[in-house]
């Protein structure tokens, strides 16, 4: 092979590597978005399962039409929600999410933490309890 052919071959490889790097970056972005969405859906699913179990137990009334349409809670529902909040379930959920490698701070909420590095914002939030 002459020098020009070798140079062209190396240039071609460089372009291919650049394209692969771009594809890898796109895949990484898509994966991050999918992880965030999966996390959000898991939380929503868990919340709905708890709500269903509370409804089945009679602790929580089914959602009234007014609440569904206008976002206004019935008085009994407010009391039940207040009891759940007082139990610290939300805090426990945040701790679990943080242990699973996700941000719980308002700056990066739901996004994966890189290499399980600690986030000062998350830690300050979790230590407020």
From Swiss-Prot:
Keywords: Cytoplasm, DNA replication, DNA replication inhibitor, Metal-binding, Zinc
Principal subcellular localisation of the protein: cytoplasm
Binding note for cofactor: Binds 1 zinc ion per subunit.
Cellular component terms (Gene Ontology): nucleoid
Cofactor(s) essential for the protein: Zn(2+)
UniProt binding sites for Zn(2+): 103, 105, 119, 122
Protein's cellular compartments: Cytoplasm, Nucleoid
UniProt family annotation: Belongs to the YabA family.
Reported function: Involved in control of chromosome replication initiation. Inhibits the cooperative binding of DnaA to the oriC region, thus negatively regulating initiation of chromosome replication. Inhibits the ability of DnaA-ATP to form a helix on DNA; does not disassemble preformed DnaA-DNA helices. Decreases the residence time of DnaA on the chromosome at its binding sites (oriC, replication forks and promoter-binding sites). Tethers DnaA to the replication machinery via the DNA polymerase beta sliding clamp subunit (dnaN).
Protein name: Replication initiation control protein YabA
Organism, as annotated: Listeria welshimeri serovar 6b (strain ATCC 35897 / DSM 20650 / CCUG 15529 / CIP 8149 / NCTC 11857 / SLCC 5334 / V8)
């Amino acid at each position: 092979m002459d020098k020009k052919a070798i140079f062209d071959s190396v240039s071609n490889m460089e372009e291919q590597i650049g394209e692969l790097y771009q594809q890898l970056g796109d895949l990484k972005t898509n994966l991050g978005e999918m992880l965030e969405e999966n996390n959000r859906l898991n939380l929503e699913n868990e919340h709905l399962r708890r709500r269903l179990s509370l409804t089945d137990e009679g602790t929580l009334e089914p959602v009234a039409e007014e609440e569904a349409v206008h976002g206004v809670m019935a008085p009994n529902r407010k009391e039940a929600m207040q009891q759940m909040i007082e139990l610290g379930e939300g805090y426990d959920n945040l701790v679990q999410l943080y242990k699973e490698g996700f941000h719980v701070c308002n700056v990066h909420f739901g996004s994966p933490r890189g290499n399980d590095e600690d986030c000062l914002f998350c830690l300050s939030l979790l230590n407020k309890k």
